[in-house]
C-alpha cells in the first residue's frame, strides 16, 4: 500500500484532484485531459490491464465507491463529437483530502470485489480530530495556463484551388471560381491585390495570417478558494469546509464553476467504546460552455482552423453574423462547409448544470483493544442536466 498525505498535495492542489497523483506514486499513471476546464483525468495502476481499454482504478471516498468513468461523452447530435463533461472523481476537493492510499493487485479485489480488479484509490477526507479547540483555515491559489504547443501550418499558399483564386460569393463553385474552397490550394500569399468576402468589392493584399490560432486562444485562469472551520474535544469533533472553484479556459467562452460543501462529524459515547462518524459532501458545478475536443464541424474550433484559409485573419471573423441577418445567417469566408470559429464558441455551446451528494455514516463498537465491530452505510447521488445549442446556418 502506497499513500499521500495532505501535505504532499497542499502546496499547489490541482483543480482536478486526480491530477494530484501524477508523478508521486510508483506504478500509478495519470493521463490528464486537454479539452478545457472540465477535462477528465484517467488513472491506471501498473499500466493497461484490460483488452477492452477499461483499466481505470476504482475510487473509494470514505468507504463509498464512486466511478471515475465518463457518462455519455458527446453531444448526442453528432457521432464525431467528443465533449468531455468531466470524470466522476473530479468532484473530490483537493483541500479536503486527508490522505490517499493506493491498493494494487489481488489485495484490492479481495477487499472490494471485482470492481477493484484494476486497483483502488482510497481517499480519506479531513475531520476535526486533529484540532485543539477551535480552528480556522483559509487557502487560496490561482493558476494560469496557455497552450503548450500549437500546430504548424503552411503559409506559402492561400485560399483557392489549382493555384488560382477569384472571389465569387463564397457559396457557389462553378469551376471558374475558387472562393468556395475550404482549402489552401490557391496562389502564393505574395501580397497581390484580390477581392475577398468582406472587402466590399475592394482589392486587398493576399497575405498569410500566421498567428491566427495564437490570437484566438486566451490565457486560462483557475482560482480556487477554501475556508474551513473545525473543533474537537474529548467527546467528539467536527469540521466544515466550503470551496469555490472558478476556471476560465484557453478557448474563449469556456468555463467551469464549482462549489463544494464538506462536513465531518464524530461523537464518542460510553467511555469511547462506541463511536459515530458521519461525512457528507455536496458539489454543485456547471459550465456555460464545454469545448468540443473531437473532429466535428458544428462545434469544434480545431476543425475550423484546419479548414480556415491561411489568408483570412481570425480577427476579421469576430462579427460572425451577416449584417441585417443577425441570428439567421453566419458571416464566414466560405459557405459550402466550415463554420466561423467565433460563432462556434459563442453560439454553438455545450452547457451543463450538475449536483452531487456523497455521504456515509458508520458506527464502531470497540469490544476490546484488538476487536471491534463496524457498521457502515453510504450513498452517492447525482443529477446532471445538459444542453446543446446549435445556431441556425451551422454546417454539420
Describe each PLM feature range.
Residues 233, 328-329, 380-381:
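Short glycine-enriched loops at secondary-structure junctions
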Residues 1-278, 358-359:
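Short, small/polar-rich motifs associated with maturation and membrane association
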Residues 249-262, 273, 281-283, 289-294, ...:
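Small-side-chain secondary-structure face that scaffolds active or pore-lining regions
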Residues 68, 110-111, 285-287, 384:
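Conserved protein kinase catalytic core
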Residues 151, 212-218, 291-293, 333-353, ...:
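Extracellular/periplasm-exposed beta-strand and loop segments of Gram-negative cell-envelope proteins
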Residues 148-194, 283-331, 388:
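A surface-exposed, glycine/aromatic-enriched loop/edge motif typical of exported proteins
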Amino acid at each position: 500500500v502506497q499513500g499521500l498525505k495532505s501535505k504532499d498535495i497542499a502546496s499547489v492542489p490541482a483543480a482536478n484532484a486526480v491530477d494530484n497523483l501524477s508523478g508521486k506514486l510508483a506504478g500509478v499513471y495519470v493521463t490528464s485531459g486537454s479539452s478545457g476546464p472540465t477535462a477528465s483525468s484517467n488513472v491506471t495502476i501498473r499500466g493497461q490491464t484490460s483488452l477492452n481499454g477499461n483499466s481505470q482504478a476504482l475510487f473509494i471516498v470514505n468507504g463509498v465507491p464512486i466511478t471515475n468513468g465518463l457518462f455519455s461523452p458527446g453531444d448526442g447530435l453528432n457521432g464525431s463529437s467528443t465533449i468531455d463533461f468531466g470524470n466522476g472523481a473530479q468532484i473530490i476537493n483537493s483541500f479536503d483530502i486527508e490522505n490517499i492510499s493506493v491498493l494494487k493487485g489481488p489485495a484490492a479485489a479481495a477487499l472490494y470485489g471485482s470492481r477493484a480488479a484494476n486497483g483502488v484509490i482510497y481517499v480519506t477526507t479531513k475531520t476535526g480530530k486533529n484540532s485543539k479547540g477551535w480552528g480556522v483555515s483559509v487557502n487560496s491559489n490561482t493558476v494560469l495556463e496557455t497552450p503548450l504547443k500549437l500546430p504548424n501550418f503552411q503559409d506559402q499558399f492561400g485560399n483557392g484551388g489549382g493555384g488560382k483564386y477569384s472571389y465569387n460569393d463564397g457559396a457557389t463553385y462553378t469551376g471558374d471560381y475558387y472562393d468556395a474552397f475550404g482549402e489552401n490550394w490557391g496562389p502564393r500569399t505574395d501580397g497581390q491585390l484580390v477581392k475577398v468576402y468582406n472587402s466590399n468589392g475592394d482589392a486587398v493584399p493576399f497575405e498569410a495570417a500566421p498567428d491566427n490560432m495564437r490570437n484566438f486562444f486566451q490565457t486560462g485562469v483557475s482560482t480556487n478558494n477554501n475556508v474551513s472551520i473545525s473543533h474537537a474535544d474529548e467527546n467528539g469533533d467536527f469540521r466544515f469546509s466550503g470551496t469555490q472553484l472558478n476556471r476560465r479556459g484557453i478557448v474563449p467562452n469556456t468555463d467551469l464553476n464549482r462549489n463544494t460543501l464538506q462536513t465531518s462529524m464524530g461523537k464518542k459515547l460510553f467511555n469511547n467504546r462506541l463511536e459515530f462518524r458521519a461525512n457528507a459532501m455536496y458539489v454543485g458545478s456547471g459550465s456555460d460552455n464545454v469545448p468540443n475536443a473531437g473532429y466535428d464541424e458544428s462545434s469544434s474550433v480545431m476543425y475550423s482552423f484546419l479548414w480556415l484559409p491561411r489568408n483570412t485573419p481570425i480577427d476579421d471573423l469576430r462579427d460572425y453574423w451577416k449584417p441585417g441577418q443577425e441570428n439567421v445567417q453566419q458571416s464566414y469566408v466560405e459557405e459550402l462547409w466550415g463554420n466561423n470559429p467565433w460563432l462556434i464558441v459563442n453560439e454553438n455551446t455545450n452547457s451543463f448544470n450538475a449536483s452531487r451528494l456523497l455521504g456515509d455514516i458508520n458506527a464502531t463498537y470497540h469490544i476490546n483493544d484488538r476487536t471491534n465491530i463496524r457498521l457502515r452505510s453510504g450513498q452517492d447521488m447525482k443529477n446532471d442536466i445538459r444542453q446543446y445549442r446549435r445556431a441556425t446556418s451551422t454546417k454539420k
